[in-house]
Amino acid sequence: MNETNDEGDRTLAGNSVTQRLDQEVHDFAMRTRFFHEDMTPGRARTFVRQHRLNTRQRNSVLKLRVATNCPDWDIRMRILDACTQEVIADEEHGGGRAHWQILEQLGVAIGMDLEGDIRAAKPLASTQMCWHAWDGLMSNTHWLEGLIANTCAERANIPGYGQGVMRE
């Protein structure tokens, strides 16, 4: 049963959709080692390599499939704006740099070689598996399912999920 709460958010049986998504993302963060283990130098390097690849693939290919299938112009424009921040330039949070460029700078700052270590990185099997799963959600299902998959993936980057350093 759909209702509306005091803030005007759509709700499902008294819980806002956003609250439910937040709970799912939090539960994922609590059961996934990445969100509560120490950030070792090796994990930091792997994060730079894989997240840089993921930022480019998900935002230049996969999210655009959702935007293409979305019939709502305003939502489509918000998806494209988010992709632009990730791939071209983020004036709001990145000082005009794309998110993949920020990750390259982070890698260099922790001692990684830009060409040989960061740009030459290949996706891990787990990264490829995630891309295949997202491809299925964003290409072969209703556009809302792709939007929800994108939303959950992005919300995990917002401080407040999991515990320890990743929560901050």
What are these regions (language model features)?
Residues M1-M77, A121-L124, L137-E145, N157-E168:
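Terminal targeting/low-complexity segments that flank the catalytic cores of oxidoreductases
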Residues L12-T18, L80-E168:
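Active-site-proximal alpha-helical scaffolds that flank and shape metal-associated catalytic sites
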